[in-house]
Structures are given as C-alpha cells and as structure tokens.
C-alpha cells in the first residue's frame, strides 16, 4: 500500500517469489515511510518473471542493502537462469553466479547498473558486465535499453547458442547453427547494446568476436567441409565473418581463407575466398568435390592432372542463401608450373603445362600465357569464350603446335606404313557445350605424300586437311581433305 499504483502494477506483473531469510527496515518517519528509509535483507531462490521484454530472473541468492536513492545486491547463487524470451528461445543457464549489481530509480524508470558478475555454465565460464534501463510505461522519458558484455575463454563453439539471438534472419541463424559443428573458443566476447526492437534496428547493436581453434567449417550442406587450424570469428547486426591463415579442404591445404555472410533486406550473400599452393592433382581433386563447379565436371573429369611443382590457386564462391542455384557465382584462378595433363577424350597427354587458367560461372574457362609440350613439341594454348562455336559453351580452346606424321600415327595407334612423312603446323579446336566438338586442321605444308595426283603432294605444297569429331554414336571421325578426298570413319575407341 505504500507504493504508487503503477509500481504495484509492475510488481504484480513481475510475480516475485522466493524466500526472505532476514530483513531489517529502518524508517525516519512513519507518516512518510518512503521519504528516508534503509533496508537490509538476505534472500534465497528469488525469482521474477519477464515483463515487457525485461529479463526474468530465476534462482537468485543475494544479500541486499537499499535506501531511497538505490540498492546494491551481492549475489552468490547456484543454478541461476536469465530469461530473455524476446532474444533467446531458451534461458541462459548458469550453474553459479558471483558478483554485484546496483539499482536506482526515478519516478518513471528503474536502472539496474554496474553489474559485474562471474558465471559458470556446464561447458564454460564467463565474466559478465550487465546494465538495463527499465521504463515503467511507454510514456516514460527513458527507453528500454540493455548493455550486456560477456567474455569467455576455453569453451566449445556450441555455447554460441547461449549468446546469438534467434531473432537474426532465419537463413542466417540456421547457417550459423550448422556452419560450426566442431571447434574450440580460445577467447571470445559478446556485446549487446540497445533495446529489443526488430533485429538490425539502428538503435541497437549485437556483436560477437572470438579466436577459434580446431574448427570444422560446414559452410554449405552437401559441400566438403573445411578444417581450420586457427581462425577468427566476427558477428554483428548485418555480417558474419570468419578468417583463417591455414586450413584444409578434402586433401588440399588452404591459406588465407575468408568466409563472409552479409545479411541484407532481400538477400543473404555468402562469400567464400581461399588460396592454395598444393600440387595440380590435389587442386583438381578438391575442385571436383565442390557442387559449385558441377557445370565444369565434364571437363575436370576428362582430365588427369599431375605434377610436383606447387600450383597457386585462388577461389571465390558467392551465392544467396535464399536462392542458391540462380545466384551462384564462382571464380577460380590457377597458376600452373610444369604440370602434366592427360585427356581421355583426346587420348593425348601434354607435359610442361604452364600458365594461368581461369574459370568463371558466366564465361567458362579462360587462359593467359599457357604453353605445354605435346609429342615433345611446344604447344601454344588459347582458352576463352571468344573461341566458342556453340551456345552455352563451357570450354572453348585452341591448340597450335607442329606435329610429325610419325607422331600422329603413334597417337592413333596406326602400325602399318603410310606414304607420308614430314612435320606440319596443326591447329586443334575443342568446344565443350551440350555436345563436344573436336576439329583438327592443317594445311600439311612440310609433309610430303607419295601418292599419284590428286592425292600426292610435295613438302612445300599446301593441301588443307580437316578432321572433326563429335560426341555422337555414329561417325566418330569425319575427314575432309579439300580437293582430294572425304571420309567418315567409326572408331569407338577414339571417344
């Protein structure tokens, strides 16, 4: 009856419960009991319910002193729970809490401040600073605002569920829950400053930063997880970022890996960047396991890549979590040095492959300064969309080199002698789209053919020849020797 009606209304809503072990109250004047007074009490298992987004408190054991200006609580309790239903689905449960919390009030608000607490949970300990401003009504001059900071050391990454608000956009919250199934927090800090408005509101901020070790980064279901030796995690209202100097994907060692999640109003973009200096075969093996590169599988699975020299590779994968397929954007850059590559399609192997290869989702494969050796002869390689001969081309390439007749016969496994010898310039065009096309062209200058006219020719004479292959069940090879002959041959082993 001594309190104002509004205070009584709030007190009733809070539903305080517990045991008052001892109480001492001193009043200066009985006719003005709230003017000057002092109180000392000891409470056990004190509990209050959540009220208008104000946290609920369960299981407080504390000694309290108070007067008309404010109060101080010395807390030493077991099995404590902090209930914040507008932020966390489950209460924050602590097996013990030790610390102090001060309070003061004015006509239209209560201020809990200078809270310094040491808490222990099942899997971690935390040092906590806590303050909250609680208005008594919507018309109060004081907005609802909480200031919470918690630091932890040596804890499993699973404790993030105790700190990361479920009010994050659902895809981002779900990603964070599944992205870090394994790992250890070496040290971390969590901050909340502001009220409890919709997530990302400009009047409030939530931030988390941690040093992690032994992390498994399951960044996308169905993709190979990355294992990060040491990493840093940062999370705020619109971004989740992780960095690692060293890691591993499949059997491939990674360096300078960065994963970023940007939460926008209409999209949630995941961006993965990494580098590697692995061997060529390790690079291709790892890339083959990425669903993001499924469009490139026909090319990668045709090739057997080897070599012992380090291959510098950078990869950038970007997509919208809300719409992965149409938004997927992949960039891969590979700097090859003295690699070997064998094509099952062409039944051909190249050595000393060096230069820069690129793959882009929109344009397919490209190259810069790529050279190799075929038949122990230098080959110039050009790869890029400008060479495409069909829509939706994945890879369009041109190979220019010199070949001896004996090399070609050996390549095709022809054991019987032919009336031709010499060396000629050859251009091979390869186009991989919904169908695969191979065109081999030469003017045969440098090759002599010891046959009667019109088939015979001298070394210096030009006699354009084109041999084409298409991935269809009939007519594997089509031969056009312009002005001399044409043929269709079926050689299944060629394809």
Residue positions per predicted region:
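C-terminal, active-site-flanking charged/polar segments
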Residues: 133-135, 232-240, 250-268, 355-359, ...
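Solvent-exposed loop/turn segments connecting transmembrane beta-strands
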Residues: 52-54, 120-125, 221-223, 250-253, ...
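Transmembrane beta-barrel architecture of outer membranes
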Residues: 22, 57-61, 94-98, 125-129, ...
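Extended, hydrophobic alpha-helical segments in both membrane/secreted and soluble proteins
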Residues: 60, 64, 112, 126-130, ...
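Hydrophobic residues on conserved beta-strands that form the core of alpha/beta folds
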Residues: 20-22, 112-114, 125-127, 187, ...
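Short beta-alpha junctions and helix-cap segments that line functional grooves
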Residues: 87, 114-116, 129-130, 229, ...
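Short solvent-exposed loop/turn micro-motifs enriched in small/polar/acidic residues
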Residues: 57, 94-96, 110, 224-227, ...
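Extended amphipathic, helix-rich lipid-handling scaffolds
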Residues: 1-51, 64, 70, 74-122, ...
């Amino acid at each position: 009856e001594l309190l104002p009606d509004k205070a009584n209304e709030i007190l009733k809503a809070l539903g305080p419960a517990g045991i008052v072990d001892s109480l001492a109250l001193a009043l200066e004047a009985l006719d003005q009991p709230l003017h000057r007074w002092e109180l000392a009490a000891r409470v056990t298992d004190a509990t209050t319910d959540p009220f208008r987004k104000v946290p609920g408190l369960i299981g407080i054991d504390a000694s309290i002193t108070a007067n008309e200006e404010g109060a101080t609580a010395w807390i030493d309790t077991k099995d404590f729970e902090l209930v914040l239903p507008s932020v966390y689905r489950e209460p924050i449960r602590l097996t013990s809490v030790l610390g102090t919390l001060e309070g003061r009030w004015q006509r239209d608000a209560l201020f809990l401040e200078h809270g310094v607490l040491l808490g222990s949970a099942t899997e971690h300990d935390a040092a906590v600073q806590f303050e909250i401003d609680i208005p008594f009504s919507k018309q109060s001059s004081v907005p609802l605002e909480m200031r919470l900071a918690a630091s932890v050391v040596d804890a499993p990454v699973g404790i993030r569920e105790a700190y990361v608000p479920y009010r994050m956009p659902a895809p981002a919250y779900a990603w964070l829950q599944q992205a870090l199934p394994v790992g250890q927090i070496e040290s971390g800090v969590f901050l909340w400053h502001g009220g409890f408005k919709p997530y990302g509101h400009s009047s409030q901020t939530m931030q988390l930063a941690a040093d992690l070790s032994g992390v498994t980064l399951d960044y996308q279901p169905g993709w190979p997880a990355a294992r990060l030796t040491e990493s840093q995690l940062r999370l705020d209202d619109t971004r989740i970022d992780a960095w690692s100097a060293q890691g591993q994907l499949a059997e491939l060692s990674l360096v300078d890996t960065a994963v970023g999640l940007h939460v926008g109003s209409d999209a949630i973009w995941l961006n993965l960047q990494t580098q590697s200096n692995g061997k060529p075969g390790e690079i291709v093996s790892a890339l083959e396991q990425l669903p993001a590169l499924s469009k490139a599988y026909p090319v990668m699975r045709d090739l057997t890549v080897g070599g012992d020299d380090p291959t510098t590779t950078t990869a950038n994968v970007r997509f919208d979590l809300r719409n992965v397929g149409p938004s997927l954007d992949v960039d891969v850059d590979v700097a090859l040095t003295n690699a070997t590559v064998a094509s099952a399609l062409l039944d051909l192997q190249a050595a000393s492959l060096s230069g820069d290869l690129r793959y882009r989702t929109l344009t397919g494969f490209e190259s810069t300064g790529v050279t190799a050796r075929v038949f122990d002869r230098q080959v110039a390689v050009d790869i890029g969309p400008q060479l495409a001969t069909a829509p939706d081309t994945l890879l369009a390439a041109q190979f220019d080199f010199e070949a001896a007749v004996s090399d070609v016969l050996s390549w095709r496994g022809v054991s019987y002698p032919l009336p031709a010898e010499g060396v000629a310039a050859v251009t091979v065009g390869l186009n991989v789209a919904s169908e695969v096309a191979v065109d081999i062209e030469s003017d045969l200058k440098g090759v002599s053919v010891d046959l009667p006219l019109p088939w015979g020719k001298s070394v210096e004479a030009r006699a354009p020849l084109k041999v084409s292959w298409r991935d269809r069940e009939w007519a594997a090879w089509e031969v056009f020797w312009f002005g001399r002959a044409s043929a269709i041959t079926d050689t299944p082993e060629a394809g």
